[in-house]
Amino acid sequence: MSEKIVQLNEEVIKGQLKELVRGSVEETLNGLLEAEAEKLTQAGRYERSEQRQGYRSGHYNRNLMTTAGEVKLHVPRLKGVTFETAIIERYRRRESSVEEALMEMYLAGVSVRRVEDITEALWGCKVSSSTISELNKKAYEHIEQWRNRPLKGGKYPYVYVDGIYLKRNWGGEYENVAILVAIAVNEDGYREVLGAAEGMKEDKESWKEFFQWLRNRGLKGIKLIVGDKCLDMLEAAGEVFPESRYQRCVVHFYRNVFSTIPRTKIKRVALMLKAIHAQENKGAARKKAEAVAEELRNMKLKEASKKICDSIEETLTYMDFPPEHWQKIRTNNVIERLNREIRRRTRVVGTFPDGHSALMLVCARLRHVAGTQWGGKKYMSMKYIEMQEDEAG
């Protein structure tokens, strides 16, 4: 008797399993939306309750792309309470990531057909060429709106500035394009990306236009500008924000000193420099700097000694501010970390067709980071500035 052989269509089974998973995900997410609505209104659908906080007013549909495929969400409409669901918030973040990824592929020179294939592999559905063009246009518009938004953080006591150099191809020739970036700590102690602009090169006119642009959007109340040594930036800041003071990034200052000494002596000199900024007040730091400069002269490191004598004062400005803030305002580390993230992203693109494309991708990344825990977590307590002002007044 011959055995019965059952032939299975693997593709059909895969499709059925995928649809089963997709349906299960859709059902689960809609169940979660209903549960969130019940929790907000403190009552189930059609339930009469004295504790009810709001009323249902039907649903609206919203498509959500998941790893299981596209699902349709039935989002409850509520009256009397605001329905902010974590599911929709995750959708918004995902949508932002998709926009950024599409823009990166576009700027990297990936063909529209290739982008269609990639989106189908990643998100389970093919994005048409017209959709890709529309998304890029939409992304650029969103970024420009975000980039030129009014600054509503009140006063911004601490501002950090830097310039990022990227490559662009202009008529077959490669040249640098500078993107000027500024972030700040607002009066409530939260970090905020103030903005980014194309500077062509870090000259005085570029910095002045950049600072004026920030001021016109609402930047005010600056007490300290932190950045690397750039005379053009300092002159521009002094003209636009004459009430501000300057703190030279201590880390960049150390590197500048290290550039004048043999590598074998860097470790020892680093400890000497750190000892200056470990002092409890500016007077003690100045005395320590004098001693370090003298020791460097004895070590035959005259150029390093001269740099300390000439520039140490601009690295000590932070000591005029609350000690609780010293560690976070004496360096540009807060913006350097952002710059590393930007460079990691822009490295994928390599060379940009123009400065505007470079600016858009930098801003896309800055906007993304600003919307994460980076911008939502308190960075420092500003009560110490208020206490210092009360004591001085």
Label every model-predicted segment.
Residues 1-89, 167:
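Short, conserved DNA-binding cores of transcription-related domains
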Residues 2-4, 35, 42, 107, ...:
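Acidic/histidine-rich catalytic cores and adjacent linkers
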Residues 33, 68, 80, 102, ...:
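Mobile genetic element proteins and their domesticated derivatives, centered on retroelements
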Residues 74-79, 87-92, 125-226, 231, ...:
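RNase H-like nuclease fold core
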Residues 84, 257-291:
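Metal-dependent DNA phosphodiester-chemistry modules and their immediately adjacent helices/loops
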Residues 97-109:
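Short, amphipathic alpha-helical "recognition" segments used to contact nucleic acids or chromatin
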Residues 113-124:
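DNA-recognition alpha helix
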Residues 224-231, 236-272:
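Conserved beta-strand -> loop -> alpha-helix junction used to position metal-binding or nucleic-acid-contacting
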